Swiss-Prot record:
Record's catalysed reaction(s): (S)-1-pyrroline-5-carboxylate + malonyl-CoA + H2O + H(+) = (2S,5S)-5-carboxymethylproline + CO2 + CoA
Entry function: Catalyzes the formation of (2S,5S)-carboxymethylproline (t-CMP) from malonyl-CoA and (S)-1-pyrroline-5-carboxylate, the first step in the biosynthesis of (5R)-carbapen-2-em-3-carboxylate, a beta-lactam antibiotic of the carbapenem class. Also catalyzes the independent decarboxylation of malonyl-CoA and methylmalonyl-CoA and the hydrolysis of CoA esters such as acetyl-CoA and propionyl-CoA. Catalyzes the reaction with a C2 epimeric mixture of methylmalonyl-CoA to give a 55:45 mixture of (6R)- and (6S)-epimers of 6-methyl-t-CMP, under standard incubation conditions.
Miscellaneous comment: Unusual member of the enoyl-CoA hydratase/isomerase family: in addition to decarboxylation and thioester hydrolysis steps, catalyzes C-C bond formation leading to a substituted heterocycle. Glu-131 is important in both C-C bond formation and thioester hydrolysis steps while it does not play an essential role in decarboxylation.
Record-listed malonyl-CoA binding positions: A60, G61, G62, D63, F64
Keywords (A to Z) from UniProt: Antibiotic biosynthesis, Transferase
Pathway: Antibiotic biosynthesis; carbapenem biosynthesis
GO BP annotations listed: antibiotic biosynthetic process; fatty acid beta-oxidation
Source organism of this protein record: Pectobacterium carotovorum subsp. carotovorum
Protein name, per record: Carboxymethylproline synthase
Length: 250
């Protein structure tokens, strides 16, 4: 469910879920983790760009076709483990990583983007963390935003559940650069080339030190987030939202 190609020393990983909004299904998660591992192990690759594809979303979050089925405790626990493992897979890449965000980055897609060293955003894209208004727990998102952007910003984003356009994302410092959609991938690759030119040893060891507490934070939130999501899914408050999104496919 991904395409992999190189632009000189930059590996471009393009998400290719059949749905243009790239919801994170189990298969897409595995494909992304495997692609990141290949890029990390390839000495010819000096930086990595992850992109949702032209006229597609970066990721609209969890795949509701799968998430709607979560009810048993063990299934919810396994799903949270998958989510945390995906995020840690990005943080463990020892090369520069760039997220090129177009369309929507919703929920899990928003959180996934925050794992990257740099984020570039199309001027028409939107970040959204809407979980709470739909009856879905947001403890993982809260932990991530609290770490990356501070407690007050985290509170605003997860409690207001609003769509954040490019100017608001810049205000919150969620992104490093905003460009036109047609220029997004080229701009991300250009930034990746800049960072790929840094001496490898200094970058690798600095990044490892920088990301270590972030990885530890995600590990710490596993059990607490399993409890939060069990309570939320077992209340079944989210089922109406899943039905509205999926329609006849529900």
């Amino acid at each position: 469910m991904v395409f992999e190609e190189n632009s000189d020393e930059v590996r471009v990983i393009t998400l290719d879920h059949p749905n243009k909004h790239n919801p994170f299904s189990r298969t897409l998660e595995t494909s992304v983790k495997d692609a990141l591992a290949r890029a990390n192990a390839d000495d010819s690759v000096r930086a990595v760009v992850v992109y949702g594809g032209a006229e597609r979303s970066f990721s609209a979050g969890g795949d509701f076709n799968e998430v709607k089925q979560l009810s048993r405790s063990e299934d919810i626990e396994e799903w949270i483990d998958r989510v945390i493992d995906l995020y840690q897979a990005v943080l463990n890449v020892n090369k520069p990583t760039i997220a090129a965000v177009d369309g929507y980055a919703i929920g899990m897609g928003f959180q996934f983007a925050l794992m990257f060293d740099q984020r570039l955003m199309a001027s028409t894209a939107n970040f959204v963390m809407p979980e709470l208004k739909h009856g879905i727990g947001c403890s993982v998102g809260a932990a991530i935003l609290g770490f990356t952007h501070g407690f007050s910003t985290m509170q605003e984003i997860i409690y207001q559940c609003q769509s954040l356009d490019a100017p608001r994302c810049v205000d919150y410092r969620l992104v490093n650069q905003v460009v036109e959609s047609s220029a997004l991938l080229d701009a991300a690759i250009t930034q990746a080339h800049v960072m790929a030119s840094y001496p490898a040893s200094a970058f690798i060891n600095t990044k490892r030190a920088v990301n270590k507490p972030f990885i530890h934070l995600l590990e710490q939130t596993r059990d607490a987030s399993k409890a939060v999501h069990k309570a939320a899914f077992q209340a079944r408050d989210a089922q109406g939202h899943f039905k509205n999104v999926l329609g006849k496919k529900y």
